[in-house]
A protein has these predicted regions:
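Conserved core segment of the aminotransferase class I/II
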Residues: 212-285
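Hydrophobic residues in well-ordered beta-strands that form the structural core
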Residues: 112, 133, 191-193, 267, ...
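Conserved core of the PLP fold type I
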Residues: 54-187, 198-217, 287, 368, ...
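Short, conserved charged micro-motifs
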Residues: 325-330, 368-372
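N-terminal small-domain helix-loop-helix segment of the aminotransferase-like
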Residues: 10-94, 98, 272-273, 340, ...
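Conserved glycine-rich beta-strand-loop-beta hairpin in the small C-terminal domain of fold type I
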Residues: 268, 285-295, 307-320, 332
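PLP-dependent enzyme catalytic core of the Aspartate aminotransferase-like
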Residues: 1, 336, 351-390
Length: 390
């Protein structure tokens, strides 16, 4: 008997990263695939003071004190907001789902970076979006291409990750942030700005969010505690311009009533506190060491195979292969060597037209195992390249 599924189910794609992580459960496998925080850096949390009342239903907007704390944090970054514009969500992934429901019908145009976050593409395309890709450069999007796209199309929104982008690790320059804000204002395009990695910075660089520079365009700004505290809490937030917030709140109510209050309570014990700042300092130093270990191993084993930039934050290296193999074809061979990685092709709107990229996570594999893991992966790529050239 044929099931009466919705039309959108024909666009439902499996998550490649979930499939890879499932295949990599053996303890001997070295995984450079996911964006998992290092388990050694998951902070010890205290539940002793959790009020019994947190077991009750809560407000769809989220806990008032947490909303106040997030609004204060955002204002310090230059985001013009009050607590009444903050919505606590079940991880910032839910922001993408809510924005998809708010804006996207079949054929709706959405502007994204090339490459962009894989799970955002999946959400937008599930709802029927036609994604318009603008190429990334080392300091942000190609501005000429961005202007040309906005002249020729009318996207419902632009989805951008300007600070240590996933997957490319690009951080937009100040000049690019100003220019992007100016273009979105000029063409009246809503901005969805995603900043899960802002706190994971390894140099002294900093840049105000793009939403803080907008003068006319509507906006949504989203973040999470998953990369700095505990991803298992499933606590994120969105802040939205006043014209969008009521619709996002109603969509949240219809999706899951409210984000879990126990996770919200725990997040509130950390945000803005001295022990949170101390934890962030330890986290940055820990990941800087792992970033440097991966840089050394890549220099040793990949210099003849790929090019890359040293990331100044986030959790990833983005490699461009000198011989543009379809990196998806390397997965099974790498797994046979007890190594997994994330192919770069699925991060593009047109995967088959963009072969030869790898995303490597440096947060999860211990520094002392990194060299061996990347040596094995380099050999897999070298062997595949020789086969293709033969």
């Amino acid at each position: 008997m044929e099931m009466a599924f919705s039309e959108r189910i024909t666009r439902l794609k499996s998550s490649l990263i979930r499939e890879i992580l499932a295949a990599a459960q053996r303890p001997e496998v070295m995984s450079f695939a996911g964006g998992l925080p290092a388990e050694a850096m998951l902070p010890a949390v205290d539940w002793a003071e959790l009020p019994a009342s947190m077991g009750q239903y809560g407000m769809s907007e989220g806990e008032p004190a947490l909303r106040e704390a997030i609004a204060a944090q955002a204002r310090a970054l230059g985001v013009p907001c009050e607590a009444c514009q903050v919505l606590i969500v079940s991880g910032s992934q839910q922001t993408l789902d809510l924005a998809s429901k708010l804006f996207i019908d079949s054929g709706t145009e959405v502007l994204v970076e090339a490459p962009t976050y894989l799970a955002a593409l999946q959400s937008f395309q599930l709802f029927g979006a036609h994604c318009l890709a603008v190429a990334q450069q080392a300091d942000g999007p190609d501005l000429a291409a961005l202007r040309a796209t906005l002249e020729q199309h009318a996207p419902a929104f632009a989805y951008l990750i300007p600070t240590f982008q996933n997957p490319s690790a690009v951080r937009y320059s100040e000049a690019k942030r100003e220019a992007v804000a100016g273009l979105l204002d000029e063409y009246g395009v809503t901005l969805l700005e995603d900043e899960p990695y802002r706190e994971l910075v390894f140099d002294q660089g900093s840049a105000r969010p793009i939403v803080s520079r907008l003068k006319r365009a509507s906006w949504i700004y989203t973040g999470t505690v998953s990369k700095t505290l505990l991803p298992g809490l499933r606590v994120g937030y969105l802040i939205a311009s006043a014209d969008l917030f009521p619709y996002l709140l109603r969509l949240k109510q219809s999706a899951d009533l409210h984000t879990n209050r126990i996770g919200q309570w725990q997040a509130l014990q950390w945000l803005g506190s001295d022990h949170y700042q101390a934890h962030l300092g330890q986290l940055r130093e820990f990941y800087r060491v792992r970033r440097d270990a991966m840089q050394a191993a890549l220099t040793e084993h990949f210099s003849d195979l790929a090019t890359w930039e040293l990331p100044q934050g986030g959790l990833f290296f983005w490699l461009t292969l000198k011989q543009p193999l379809d990196s998806r074809t390397l997965l099974n061979r790498a797994l046979a060597e007890d190594v997994v990685f994330m192919p770069g092709e699925p991060f593009f709107v047109e995967p088959d037209a963009n072969p030869g990229y790898l995303r490597l996570n440096f947060s999860h594999v211990a520094a002392e195992r990194m060299d061996e893991g990347l040596r094995r992966l380099a050999q897999v790529i070298r062997d595949a390249g020789a086969l293709e050239a033969a």
